[in-house]
Amino acid sequence: MKPLDFRRIALSLEGAEEGSHMGAADFRVGGRIFATLASEKQGYGNLMLTPELQAGFVGELPDVFLPIHGGWGRMGMTHIRLAKASEDVLAGALRAAWKLRLEKNKGTKKKRTPKRG
């Protein structure tokens, strides 16, 4: 797979939109990021997963998935090696990140500023 495939599949998910974060393409649903191409020059896509989901993906396909280095990786942020991923694997991983973001969005309320009288 290539970054164009990552982009195509990410944008095929309902409500997904492309944005930019620190100069890199990101993919959002409900205004929140679920995946990025911040590491595309290194051959990776990035997925916003939970540590548990990350462990499952890495355990099943360690040649395709690896935690992002440092604290982000400990929080579940995961690289997917695009050259080693099949379309089905990439689509499944993006769908998992998208679904997780949708679930998190349901529990997120926007802060309201108090009315001044």
Give the residues covered by each predicted segment:
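Charge-dense, helix-prone N-terminal extensions
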Residues: 1-117
